[in-house]
Amino acid sequence: MHDILEPRHHMIDYVEFASADPQTMCVFYEATLGWSFEWFGPDYVAFHGAGLEGGIYRADIVSRSADGGALIVLNSRDLEASEALVLSHGANI
């Protein structure tokens, strides 16, 4: 189970990401960032533990920052260690 975040006035409350392969995204984010996931059928999953609640849905067309999509910035207390961790799980930086 997860804690529900208290809604904050005029703050982003929930974000959704399109993915051709939500399962692979979940495996990556769980292994690298410790997020947890709650599936609602095979094509939608909510994520928790990211500092913001959100979801991932299966889609044939996905947004990419290079094409003008949103750029999401994650914080790290140890950038080199975080970089090594995500690279070890197949990320491209």
Regions found by a protein language model. Name each.
Residues 31-37, 90-93:
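Conserved acetyl-CoA-binding loop of GNAT-fold acetyltransferases
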Residues 25-30, 86:
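Conserved active-site tyrosine of GNAT-family acetyltransferases
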Residues 5-8, 30, 49, 65:
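Generic structural signal for beta-strand residues in well-ordered domains
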Residues 5, 59-64, 92-93:
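A general structural signal for short secondary-structure boundary/capping elements
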Residues 1-26, 69-74:
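N-terminal beta-strand motif that seeds the catalytic metal site of vicinal oxygen chelate
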Residues 35-69:
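Conserved short beta-strand elements that form part of the metal-binding/catalytic scaffold
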Residues 21-22, 72-93:
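Vicinal oxygen chelate
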